[in-house]
Structures are given as C-alpha cells and as structure tokens.
Amino acid sequence: MIEPFDLRPFSPFFMLKFCLKRQKSYLRTKYLKMKRACFLLVAMLATAIQLSAEITLPSIISDNMVLQQKTDAKLWGWGEPGEKIEIRTSWGKKVYSTLTNADGKWSVYVKTPGHCSGQWVKVSSGRTGETVEISNVLVGEVWMASGQSNMEFEMMPHKKDTWMTGMYNWEEEAADAGYPDIHLFKVEEDWDHNVVRDNCKGEWVVCSPEVAKRYSAIAFLFARELHKELRRPVGIVLCAFGGTHAESWIRDEVMRRDSIYNRVYKGYSPGMPVIDKYPHKAPAAIWNAMVNPILGYTVKGNIWYQAESNAWRAEDYAPIFIDLVNDWRSSWGQKRLPFYFMQVAPYGELPGAVRLEQAKVWENGLLKDIGMATAIDVGDSLDIHPKNKVVPAHRFALWALAKEYGKKVECCGPLLEKVSVEGNRMVLSFGHSKGLYVLNAAGEKVSAGVNYLYVAGTDGNFHPALSEIIGGKLHVWSPDVPAPAQVKYCTEDYCKGNLYNAAGLPAYPFVH
C-alpha cells in the first residue's frame, strides 16, 4: 500500500517552525562561540591585570602628581613579597632600589630638585621587568587641605548637596582658574568603622575652570595665591568630609588610651541608630578610610578647617585637637608638620565657646608650628557655611607665606597681650596691632565703637562697653561698671568682629 505523500513539511506553519528551530540552533551556536570568546577575553584581561598588578601604586602616586621640592619625598606601593623594586626619575641619574616586605609593600624616599614641571617617575619590577611610568609630574609646594564642610565647600552651587550654595562671585573666581602648574587631588568621601585601608579613590587633575568650580573653594584659592606669590607649581591634597567630629580623624589606638574619648565611643557604639544615620561621625571612621591611605605623602604643611561638629562639647576640643596634630605628625613621619587652622566662623546656633577652645591651643603655646587664622568677621547668622571663602583662603595663605616661605607679610590679627586698670577704664594692649582701627557699619576706619565688647566688675555681671583707641591701645569702660575687673570680646554664638590692624586682619576673641 502506498502511503500518502506527507505535505506537512510544505505547510506554512511547519516551514515557519522549522526555520525558527534552525535559527534557534544557529543563535545558540553563535551564543556559545561568543560566550567562549568572551570567557577567553576575560581570562586574557584577568591575566593582563594580574601582570600589571605585580606593581600596584596608591591612587595618590599617579599621573599629574606633585612632589614637594628640595626634600626626600616618600613613594610607596605593592608587589610580590621579596620582590626588588627600582625607581628612576627624570631629574636625576640615581636608581633607588628596595625590596618588598612580607606583605608585599615597599617604600622609598626620593630626593627632589627645586621646583620644575614636566617630569616623570618610573617604577620597575626587578623580577618581571615590568615598568610603570608616572607622567606629567610637578615638583613644587604640596599642601594638605582637610577638615569638614567649610573646607569641602565647593566654589559653584551644588544641585545635589544643596548646602553647598556656592561662594560669592564664583563665576569670576572660576574664570581665573586655568593654571597648568596647579594640580589638585581629592580623596573621595568614605568611612570605615573596622578596616584601616591602604588606598582610596581619587586622582590628580590639572587645574582648570571646570575642575576648580567643583573643588574646595578655600583649597583652590589658597593654592592660587601661593602659586602667584611664589611662582612655583602647587599641589593640593584635599581630604575633607562635612559633619565630621575631630575624633573621626584620629587613630583608634590613640583614643583608646584616654578617657576623654569615652563619651564619643559610647555615643557611636555599634548598633546605635546614630551610627546608621551618621556613619562618618564615628571615631576613627575618616582616619581609616581617607587619612591612612595617603599617610606619609610628603607635604609642606596642612590647612585645617574643622570644629563646628565639636562645638556642643567645646570643653574637650583643645586636648582632642592636640592629640590629632601630634598623632598626624608622628604617623606622617614629619615631626615638624605645620598646622594652620581656622577659628570657625560665627553662626546663630553654633556655641561660641568652641572658638575660645581653639584659641587656647595656639595662644597658650600648647603646640609648636601651628597658627590660627580667624573668620570672626565673615560669619553668617543664618548659615553655618558662609559664602565668603576668599577671606579665609587669603588668611590661610598669609600664614603659609609668612611662616613657611619667609615673606614679610602680617599673618596675625591683634592679639590681646596685657590689660591694666586706670581708674574706671581698662586699657588693652595688643600684639600685631600696628595701625589699630575700628571698622564701622559704613565701612569707615574710625577709632571708637568696637562691637561685642563687654566689661564687668568683680561680680561677673558684664555690661556693653564703650571704647576708644588712644596711642595704639584700646581704652574700655562702661558707666554701669565703676570698678572694671573683667573684659571680653566676641564671645557670643553669633558676632561680627570689627577691630582690625593695618593689614586688615581682625582681632581674636578673648576673655580676660
């Protein structure tokens, strides 16, 4: 019997199904081939990465970096344990050689020349011959800029972080930011409660208007002034995080030795809601993630703007700040690491006592190689982040220029030195008081009318004081205090100092 001819293969439905099946088989074959090719590519890339990772450098030692001039600058990285590492530089014939330790880490100190640009550093493996070249290296002046939000505050208004409202005249300042001999590094914000990290996110970039407007306003303006005054390359290492306590910036081992830190450890212990809401405020959190990774990078000095977050327990600030400075100097391997810090700007809700605690460290000589600039006259009663960043940056620069570079500029405002009583008046003598004057509300230089000035008798009841500058000294009195015994200036939470010297620098707050 003859079977009927099967017409199914010729039916449109069957033909479509057959084609789809063949297409599916074809696609699967192509997929497997592509998958295998991708696997091989990934394997090749992994091998390449592994090979290149035999010499690993921290983010701060990279293209566009700036090395401190005329010193022994520290370089470091990682390789295989026991591996020989060689370093060559474009400015010298010497080959620096060292061996990695058991953990694979190595470090060397390279002698740097006077300021120059367009240099390179080559790091080579003695085992594999692999060489990593760091290009466009500058040799000049390197400064750290660290602290909390007023140091972090960017030049341009920020859409996401709305507290960054932008500095005054930011467009004009950004337009004057095209400086190929200023390079900027920013440690990306991070924290860690448990692990002390050895690297961080960040890169060196050449200063331009686009870069500068998204960088710390104070740090950039400080760098620009140094560059113009010194005519040398300048590098800034920005390490700042808003809302952080001083304790966030100190090593855990240091704080565990002193009971003064018990309160903050108790307040930020694991499991507490505050640690989830404000993880960056925890003790050592910023040290672990942001400071330790750049530890030892050779710098000329540090400018520091922080204390707002410590203001509500101001009585502890002086010893904590002393611990911070001493530990940074010791850990950095730079015993004379200059620290120039800002006396924080007045703000309506910020306890003014913290400014006096800051002043104790400097005025009482509790640390060497430090200096305090002040923002006592540029605060904002409604905003803890004043828009005037030109003035603080300039005052930081004056300290650096005067103390580190020998420039004959005044860096210090009038500083109370002596108080005497003459009848119903107190006579105040100041250091750094050449050309002492009062700036009135109309912006005129006058000899009377100091703001936020008070006197008291032995009863301690302070009354607003009248004042007059006579012979370079400030005479102070009040009709309500016939026998004055105490005097204070600019100690309120919000105030605006108006007593200046000829350099335009304001007098520091005081209580006597």
Regions found by a protein language model. Give the residues of each.
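Cell-envelope and extracellular/periplasmic
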Residues: 54-512
